[in-house]
Design a protein with these regions (language model features):
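Structural preference for solvent-exposed beta-strand-turn elements
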Residues: 1-390
Length: 390
């Protein structure tokens, strides 16, 4: 939105992570001027200054030599840039890591083709080649069964493209992420200005979960500072699900923070069922299988049926956790490790995708962190400053 604006836009408190850098790098490669400055209040954030180009998207390459843009495993960047580049001129090619090439993109590609754009892809996934065509002033329908990012991508570009976007099914009207996109579009300073970005509630869930499970040992209460209050983020509701109820839905109750809830569920004094988990299978890894496998290692009793997991209460033990290069697997089990001794996280640097300072926050002394003891593979205590994922 800032790149599409008619002036200079300052974005304060922007999370600085691998996903953010992927988007900034792609826009810079296209020719946008973006200044990145340190945030004096939070070391893990940046203040960005973006020079908007009034809806003019820089020209790509030719069909024989398209402009190459790499998105890593950033699903948001992949989906948003796919729609964004359709409104440029010339030819662009989007690619990512192997897992990104497995993740769904078909509903978005089909909607853009309905709008009149030519997109080449062997299987309606990345890598793909976009032959841009500018505004088309047409209508399309899009399904968000696999990801609400498909609708968000189209809505962000709808005004510039002259698109009328309709969302299929009941999920469209109820999706909190689609509602958040619409709210942001309505309040964004499109003529230039400043926008303060609120903290990410999904990332905050690990600390609320830690506070909850540690309170079972009568530890001092833990509070997450500057908790989001806009009402836009579904995961801001995480605190209302502590202690966990009997049933939690990925579709109706929580977003990504449902993974946090699943991991701490064995510590609840009753059986908990998690339903509507189908989207978890299509993200950074096959998350339903990963959660079941790693929790079982820790001694949890889990039943998988269709798109649900039923978890029984019970005592847990330490285990080596395979993260599948998934940041949320690493962070969820790290939070569990504050309660269960012996949790060992493989490839902890995967948290750089969305929260590079996560382990720093665990180890830093209060009030800036939890003061947790974190050991390396040889049993040596690590300082907080050593735990920032580069």
């Amino acid at each position: 939105l800032a790149a599409l604006s008619n002036g200079e836009v300052k974005l304060d408190n922007a999370l600085w992570s691998e996903d953010t850098q992927v988007m900034v790098d792609a826009l810079r490669q296209l020719g946008y001027k973006i200044e990145v400055n340190l945030d004096s209040l939070e070391s893990g954030n940046r203040n960005l200054i973006i020079q908007g180009r009034g809806g003019s998207i820089p020209k790509g390459g030719t069909p024989e030599n398209p402009m190459e843009l790499f998105v890593g495993n950033a699903g948001t960047a992949a989906r948003f840039l796919t729609a964004f580049l359709c409104l440029g001129k010339g030819t662009y090619r989007l690619s990512g890591i192997s897992r990104m090439h497995e993740r769904p993109q078909a509903s978005l590609i089909e909607a853009l083709r309905t709008l009149g754009y030519c997109i080449d892809s062997k299987n309606n996934k990345l890598p793909l080649t976009i032959h841009a065509g500018g505004p088309t002033f047409k209508s399309c329908r899009v399904s968000i069964e696999e990801s609400s990012q498909f609708a968000s991508a189209l809505l962000l570009l709808a005004k510039l493209g002259g698109w009328n976007v309709e969302i299929d099914g009941e999920l469209g009207a109820k999706s909190p992420y689609v509602a958040m996109t619409s709210s942001l579009i309505d309040c964004f300073p499109t003529e230039g200005g400043r926008l303060k970005i609120e903290p990410d509630a999904s990332s905050g869930s690990y600390f609320w979960a830690a506070g909850h499970i540690l309170s079972l040992n009568n530890c001092l209460p833990l509070k997450v500072a500057r908790w989001p209050k806009s009402g836009w983020q579904i995961d801001a509701e995480f605190t209302s699900f502590l202690p966990l109820p009997n049933i939690v839905s990925r579709r109706d109750d929580l977003g990504d923070s449902i993974m946090t809830a699943i991991v701490i569920a064995p510590l609840t004094g009753h059986q908990t069922q998690f339903v509507n988990l189908e989207r978890l299978r299509l993200q950074e890894c096959e998350r339903v299988q990963a959660l079941r496998t790693e929790l079982t290692k820790c001694g949890a009793t889990i039943q998988e049926a269709g798109e649900s997991l039923t978890i029984s209460p019970g005592e847990l033990k330490g285990a080596e956790i395979e993260t599948y290069d998934d940041h949320r697997i690493a962070m969820s089990f790290a939070a569990l490790g504050l309660k269960v001794p012996g949790i060992r996280i493989k490839n902890p640097c995967c948290v750089r995708k969305t929260f590079p300072t996560f382990f720093y926050k665990l180890a830093a002394p209060a009030p800036h962190g939890l003061g947790a003891t974190i050991l390396d593979g040889k049993g040596n205590k690590l300082k907080a400053e050593q735990l920032i994922a580069g």
